[in-house]
Amino acid sequence: MSVEHQDAMYDHILVPTDGSAGSVKAAEHAVDLAEKYSGDIHALYVVNVGRLEGMSLNVPGSIDRLEEEGKEYIQDVVDTAENAGVEATSAIELGRPAKTIIEYADENGSDLIVIGTQGRGGLSRRLLGSVTEQVVRLANVPVHTVRADED
């Protein structure tokens, strides 16, 4: 008895990015999976409103500056995908990262989330990173974590 390989296992792969080494490595891994399963990539950057608390959102350019930073990060993911012949789309959302990533995955029919284990939080992050840990616990789709130093 043979089991057929399911080619369309991951049609839509979500790659949240913050420009960190972990998210860059996650994007590369996601593109490999998209190639293997003929899927596409959704690059997502979340402007973290938690970082903005206590700051005046009326300061000229405060949100714009963070969105511009995010555009660079998601463009890197899109370029990686397109260079491999994988279709890619991108989005910038305003919110709390873990919650926004999960909502985006649900609203856009993502089959898989590929996320780095450590973002830009440095030493304040524990083992996985607080955003990654929350996404792993709460997402309604499979989550694949990728270490920044993974070969």
Regions found by a protein language model. Name each.
Residues 26-27, 53-56, 102-103, 125-127:
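Short, well-ordered secondary-structure micro-motifs
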Residues 44, 89-93, 144:
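General small-molecule cofactor/ligand-binding pocket signal
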Residues 45-72:
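Acidic, proline/glycine-rich short linear motifs
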Residues 1-2, 107-151:
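Gly/Ser-rich helix-loop-strand patches that form or flank binding pockets
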Residues 29, 66-77, 100:
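Short, solvent-exposed amphipathic alpha-helices that sit
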Residues 6-55:
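Small/aliphatic-rich secondary-structure junction motif
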Residues 2-8, 79-113, 150-151:
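Structural beta-alpha unit
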